[in-house]
Protein backbone atom coordinates (compact mmCIF):
# COMPACT_ATOMS: atom_id res chain seq x y z
CA UNK A 1 0.00 0.00 0.00
CA UNK A 2 1.38 3.40 -0.99
CA UNK A 3 1.18 6.31 1.38
CA UNK A 4 2.56 9.83 1.13
CA UNK A 5 4.03 11.95 3.86
CA UNK A 6 6.09 15.12 4.10
CA UNK A 7 9.73 15.08 5.17
CA UNK A 8 12.42 17.73 5.16
CA UNK A 9 15.82 17.92 3.52
CA UNK A 10 18.12 20.90 3.98
CA UNK A 11 15.19 23.00 5.18
CA UNK A 12 13.03 22.20 2.16
CA UNK A 13 9.78 20.23 2.19
CA UNK A 14 10.00 17.07 0.12
CA UNK A 15 7.62 14.19 -0.53
CA UNK A 16 8.28 10.63 0.51
CA UNK A 17 6.48 7.79 -1.25
CA UNK A 18 7.20 4.44 0.33
CA UNK A 19 5.58 1.17 1.25
CA UNK A 20 5.15 0.07 4.83
CA UNK A 21 7.89 -2.27 5.96
CA UNK A 22 7.13 -5.12 8.29
CA UNK A 23 9.08 -5.55 11.50
CA UNK A 24 11.30 -8.35 10.17
CA UNK A 25 14.95 -7.43 9.73
CA UNK A 26 16.06 -7.18 6.11
CA UNK A 27 19.57 -7.78 4.72
CA UNK A 28 20.04 -4.29 3.24
CA UNK A 29 18.84 -2.27 6.22
CA UNK A 30 21.00 0.78 7.02
CA UNK A 31 22.10 0.96 3.37
CA UNK A 32 21.40 4.32 1.73
CA UNK A 33 20.84 4.32 -2.03
CA UNK A 34 20.54 7.47 -4.15
CA UNK A 35 18.60 6.82 -7.35
CA UNK A 36 19.21 9.23 -10.21
CA UNK A 37 17.42 7.18 -12.83
CA UNK A 38 14.13 7.71 -14.63
CA UNK A 39 11.62 5.42 -16.28
CA UNK A 40 12.59 1.77 -15.92
CA UNK A 41 16.10 0.33 -15.69
CA UNK A 42 17.53 2.44 -12.86
CA UNK A 43 14.25 2.68 -10.93
CA UNK A 44 13.74 -1.09 -11.17
CA UNK A 45 17.17 -1.64 -9.60
CA UNK A 46 16.32 0.85 -6.85
CA UNK A 47 13.00 -0.86 -6.27
CA UNK A 48 14.68 -4.25 -5.86
CA UNK A 49 17.16 -2.87 -3.32
CA UNK A 50 14.27 -1.29 -1.45
CA UNK A 51 12.48 -4.64 -1.23
CA UNK A 52 15.30 -5.90 0.96
CA UNK A 53 15.47 -2.98 3.34
CA UNK A 54 17.68 -0.36 1.70
CA UNK A 55 16.73 3.29 2.16
CA UNK A 56 16.23 4.43 -1.44
CA UNK A 57 16.11 8.18 -2.09
CA UNK A 58 14.90 8.88 -5.61
CA UNK A 59 15.86 12.17 -7.25
CA UNK A 60 13.11 13.21 -9.67
CA UNK A 61 13.07 16.14 -12.09
CA UNK A 62 10.56 18.96 -11.55
CA UNK A 63 7.18 17.47 -12.45
CA UNK A 64 8.26 13.98 -11.42
CA UNK A 65 9.35 10.83 -13.20
CA UNK A 66 7.43 10.42 -16.49
CA UNK A 67 6.26 6.99 -15.32
CA UNK A 68 3.97 8.78 -12.86
CA UNK A 69 1.69 9.61 -15.81
CA UNK A 70 2.04 6.55 -18.05
CA UNK A 71 -0.80 4.15 -18.87
CA UNK A 72 -3.59 3.61 -16.36
CA UNK A 73 -3.92 6.43 -13.80
CA UNK A 74 -5.78 6.17 -10.49
CA UNK A 75 -6.13 9.01 -7.98
CA UNK A 76 -3.81 11.14 -10.10
CA UNK A 77 -0.94 8.64 -10.21
CA UNK A 78 -0.03 5.91 -12.67
CA UNK A 79 -0.55 2.39 -11.40
CA UNK A 80 2.77 1.54 -13.05
CA UNK A 81 4.45 4.12 -10.82
CA UNK A 82 3.01 2.42 -7.75
CA UNK A 83 5.04 -0.62 -8.72
CA UNK A 84 8.33 1.16 -9.48
CA UNK A 85 8.01 3.95 -6.90
CA UNK A 86 7.30 1.92 -3.79
CA UNK A 87 9.92 1.60 -1.05
CA UNK A 88 11.39 4.98 -2.00
CA UNK A 89 11.71 8.50 -0.64
CA UNK A 90 11.24 10.93 -3.52
CA UNK A 91 12.86 14.34 -3.86
CA UNK A 92 12.24 16.71 -6.77
CA UNK A 93 15.42 18.55 -7.80
CA UNK A 94 16.48 20.23 -11.03
CA UNK A 95 19.90 18.77 -11.81
CA UNK A 96 20.32 21.30 -14.60
CA UNK A 97 20.78 23.98 -11.95
CA UNK A 98 23.79 24.48 -9.70
CA UNK A 99 21.55 24.54 -6.62
CA UNK A 100 20.01 21.19 -7.51
CA UNK A 101 23.40 19.60 -8.15
CA UNK A 102 24.81 20.96 -4.88
CA UNK A 103 21.95 19.40 -2.92
CA UNK A 104 22.56 16.05 -4.60
CA UNK A 105 26.28 16.26 -3.80
CA UNK A 106 25.42 16.77 -0.13
CA UNK A 107 23.26 13.66 -0.19
CA UNK A 108 25.98 11.68 -1.95
CA UNK A 109 28.35 12.22 0.96
CA UNK A 110 25.98 10.16 3.11
CA UNK A 111 25.21 7.47 0.51
CA UNK A 112 26.42 3.90 0.21
CA UNK A 113 25.19 3.34 -3.35
CA UNK A 114 24.25 5.43 -6.38
CA UNK A 115 22.12 4.06 -9.23
CA UNK A 116 21.84 6.08 -12.44
CA UNK A 117 20.72 5.49 -16.01
CA UNK A 118 21.55 8.76 -17.75
CA UNK A 119 23.18 8.80 -21.16
CA UNK A 120 26.96 8.44 -20.65
CA UNK A 121 28.67 11.81 -20.30
CA UNK A 122 25.74 13.75 -18.86
CA UNK A 123 26.65 13.28 -15.21
CA UNK A 124 30.31 14.02 -15.99
CA UNK A 125 29.17 17.36 -17.38
CA UNK A 126 27.27 18.06 -14.17
CA UNK A 127 30.08 16.99 -11.85
CA UNK A 128 28.06 14.04 -10.56
CA UNK A 129 30.28 11.33 -12.03
CA UNK A 130 32.04 8.61 -9.98
CA UNK A 131 35.42 10.35 -9.90
CA UNK A 132 33.90 13.58 -8.57
CA UNK A 133 31.65 11.94 -5.98
CA UNK A 134 34.13 9.33 -4.76
CA UNK A 135 36.58 12.12 -3.98
CA UNK A 136 34.30 13.04 -1.05
CA UNK A 137 32.97 9.52 -0.44
CA UNK A 138 35.72 7.00 -1.30
CA UNK A 139 33.59 3.98 -0.37
CA UNK A 140 30.71 4.90 -2.67
CA UNK A 141 29.35 2.17 -4.95
CA UNK A 142 28.33 3.81 -8.22
CA UNK A 143 26.10 1.72 -10.53
CA UNK A 144 25.61 2.96 -14.09
CA UNK A 145 23.03 1.56 -16.51
CA UNK A 146 23.12 2.61 -20.16
CA UNK A 147 22.29 1.21 -23.56
CA UNK A 148 25.81 0.28 -24.62
CA UNK A 149 28.06 0.78 -21.60
CA UNK A 150 30.30 3.67 -20.58
CA UNK A 151 33.01 2.97 -23.18
CA UNK A 152 33.06 1.82 -26.79
CA UNK A 153 31.83 3.17 -30.14
CA UNK A 154 28.13 3.29 -29.14
CA UNK A 155 28.65 4.53 -25.57
CA UNK A 156 27.42 8.07 -26.17
CA UNK A 157 24.24 6.97 -27.92
CA UNK A 158 20.97 7.05 -26.03
CA UNK A 159 19.98 3.45 -25.36
CA UNK A 160 16.44 2.12 -25.14
CA UNK A 161 15.42 -1.43 -24.33
CA UNK A 162 13.52 -1.68 -27.61
CA UNK A 163 16.72 -1.21 -29.64
CA UNK A 164 19.03 -3.09 -27.28
CA UNK A 165 16.79 -6.16 -27.26
CA UNK A 166 17.09 -6.22 -31.04
CA UNK A 167 20.86 -5.63 -31.16
CA UNK A 168 21.43 -8.49 -28.71
CA UNK A 169 19.66 -10.92 -31.05
CA UNK A 170 16.90 -11.66 -28.55
CA UNK A 171 14.08 -10.36 -30.72
CA UNK A 172 15.20 -12.43 -33.68
CA UNK A 173 15.07 -15.76 -31.85
CA UNK A 174 11.90 -14.66 -30.04
CA UNK A 175 9.94 -14.29 -33.28
CA UNK A 176 8.23 -16.53 -35.79
CA UNK A 177 9.87 -18.05 -38.89
CA UNK A 178 9.61 -15.72 -41.88
CA UNK A 179 8.14 -12.85 -39.88
CA UNK A 180 9.45 -9.67 -38.27
CA UNK A 181 11.29 -9.96 -34.93
CA UNK A 182 8.89 -9.86 -31.99
CA UNK A 183 8.98 -7.60 -28.96
CA UNK A 184 7.43 -9.02 -25.79
CA UNK A 185 4.74 -6.81 -24.30
CA UNK A 186 6.99 -6.03 -21.33
CA UNK A 187 10.19 -4.00 -21.00
CA UNK A 188 12.43 -7.01 -20.48
CA UNK A 189 15.63 -5.20 -21.50
CA UNK A 190 15.13 -2.62 -18.76
CA UNK A 191 14.24 -5.03 -15.97
CA UNK A 192 16.99 -7.51 -16.86
CA UNK A 193 19.62 -4.76 -16.88
CA UNK A 194 18.23 -3.54 -13.56
CA UNK A 195 18.69 -7.03 -12.14
CA UNK A 196 22.26 -7.17 -13.47
CA UNK A 197 22.89 -3.83 -11.76
CA UNK A 198 21.59 -5.19 -8.46
CA UNK A 199 23.85 -8.24 -8.76
CA UNK A 200 26.81 -5.96 -9.50
CA UNK A 201 25.95 -3.71 -6.55
CA UNK A 202 25.78 -6.64 -4.14
CA UNK A 203 29.14 -7.97 -5.34
CA UNK A 204 30.63 -4.47 -5.09
CA UNK A 205 29.35 -4.15 -1.51
CA UNK A 206 30.99 -7.46 -0.68
CA UNK A 207 34.27 -6.27 -2.23
CA UNK A 208 33.97 -3.00 -0.32
CA UNK A 209 33.61 -4.81 2.99
CA UNK A 210 36.77 -6.78 2.25
CA UNK A 211 38.67 -3.65 1.19
CA UNK A 212 37.62 -1.67 4.26
CA UNK A 213 38.62 -4.60 6.47
CA UNK A 214 42.09 -4.36 4.91
CA UNK A 215 42.21 -0.61 5.48
CA UNK A 216 41.61 0.34 1.85
CA UNK A 217 38.92 2.43 0.16
CA UNK A 218 36.11 0.31 -1.21
CA UNK A 219 34.58 2.50 -3.90
CA UNK A 220 33.49 0.69 -7.04
CA UNK A 221 31.87 1.47 -10.39
CA UNK A 222 29.34 -1.02 -11.77
CA UNK A 223 28.92 -0.60 -15.54
CA UNK A 224 25.77 -2.28 -16.93
CA UNK A 225 24.74 -2.19 -20.60
CA UNK A 226 21.21 -3.05 -21.66
CA UNK A 227 22.34 -4.94 -24.75
CA UNK A 228 24.92 -6.96 -22.80
CA UNK A 229 22.31 -7.88 -20.20
CA UNK A 230 20.07 -9.23 -22.96
CA UNK A 231 23.08 -10.91 -24.60
CA UNK A 232 23.64 -12.74 -21.33
CA UNK A 233 20.20 -14.37 -21.66
CA UNK A 234 20.96 -16.08 -24.97
CA UNK A 235 22.09 -19.34 -23.35
CA UNK A 236 23.68 -21.63 -25.98
CA UNK A 237 23.01 -19.35 -28.97
CA UNK A 238 26.57 -17.97 -29.05
CA UNK A 239 28.57 -21.15 -28.33
CA UNK A 240 26.44 -23.05 -30.88
CA UNK A 241 27.41 -20.51 -33.52
CA UNK A 242 31.05 -20.41 -32.43
CA UNK A 243 31.50 -24.15 -32.08
CA UNK A 244 29.14 -25.57 -34.71
CA UNK A 245 28.34 -22.68 -37.05
CA UNK A 246 24.65 -22.98 -36.20
CA UNK A 247 22.55 -19.81 -36.26
CA UNK A 248 19.58 -20.22 -33.93
CA UNK A 249 16.39 -19.44 -35.84
CA UNK A 250 13.09 -18.04 -34.57
CA UNK A 251 10.75 -20.81 -33.48
CA UNK A 252 7.54 -19.09 -32.43
CA UNK A 253 6.09 -20.64 -29.28
CA UNK A 254 8.50 -23.60 -29.25
CA UNK A 255 12.09 -24.00 -28.05
CA UNK A 256 14.60 -25.27 -30.60
CA UNK A 257 15.72 -28.85 -29.98
CA UNK A 258 13.31 -29.59 -27.12
CA UNK A 259 10.09 -31.56 -27.72
CA UNK A 260 7.37 -31.46 -26.61
CA UNK A 261 7.33 -27.92 -25.30
CA UNK A 262 4.74 -25.69 -26.88
CA UNK A 263 1.32 -24.11 -26.59
CA UNK A 264 -1.40 -26.46 -27.81
CA UNK A 265 -5.00 -25.64 -28.70
CA UNK A 266 -7.63 -27.68 -26.90
CA UNK A 267 -11.05 -28.89 -28.05
CA UNK A 268 -12.74 -26.04 -26.17
CA UNK A 269 -10.61 -23.46 -28.07
CA UNK A 270 -8.55 -22.70 -24.97
CA UNK A 271 -4.81 -23.31 -24.83
CA UNK A 272 -2.58 -25.47 -22.67
CA UNK A 273 1.19 -25.15 -22.27
CA UNK A 274 3.01 -28.49 -22.10
CA UNK A 275 6.68 -28.86 -21.25
CA UNK A 276 7.82 -32.48 -21.41
CA UNK A 277 11.45 -31.44 -21.15
CA UNK A 278 13.11 -34.70 -20.14
CA UNK A 279 12.82 -38.44 -20.70
CA UNK A 280 11.14 -39.23 -17.37
CA UNK A 281 8.76 -36.28 -17.68
CA UNK A 282 7.94 -37.31 -21.25
CA UNK A 283 7.18 -40.86 -20.13
CA UNK A 284 4.78 -39.62 -17.45
CA UNK A 285 3.18 -37.26 -19.96
CA UNK A 286 2.56 -40.08 -22.44
CA UNK A 287 1.09 -42.21 -19.66
CA UNK A 288 -1.26 -39.37 -18.70
CA UNK A 289 -2.27 -38.84 -22.33
CA UNK A 290 -2.92 -42.55 -22.72
Whereabouts are the PLM-identified features?
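N-terminal helix-loop segment corresponding to the beta1-alpha1 unit
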Residues: 11, 20-214
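Acidic, glycine-rich segments within the central catalytic cores of soluble metabolic enzymes
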Residues: 167, 171-290
Amino acid sequence: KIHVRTIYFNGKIITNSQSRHNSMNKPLENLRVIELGQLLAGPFAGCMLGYFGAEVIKIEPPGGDPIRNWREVKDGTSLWWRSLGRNKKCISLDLKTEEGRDLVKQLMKTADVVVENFRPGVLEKWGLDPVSLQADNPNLIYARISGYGQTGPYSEKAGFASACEAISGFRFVNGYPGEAPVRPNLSIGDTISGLHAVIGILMALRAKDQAVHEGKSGGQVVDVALYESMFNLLEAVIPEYDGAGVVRQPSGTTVTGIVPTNTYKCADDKFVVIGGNGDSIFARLMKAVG
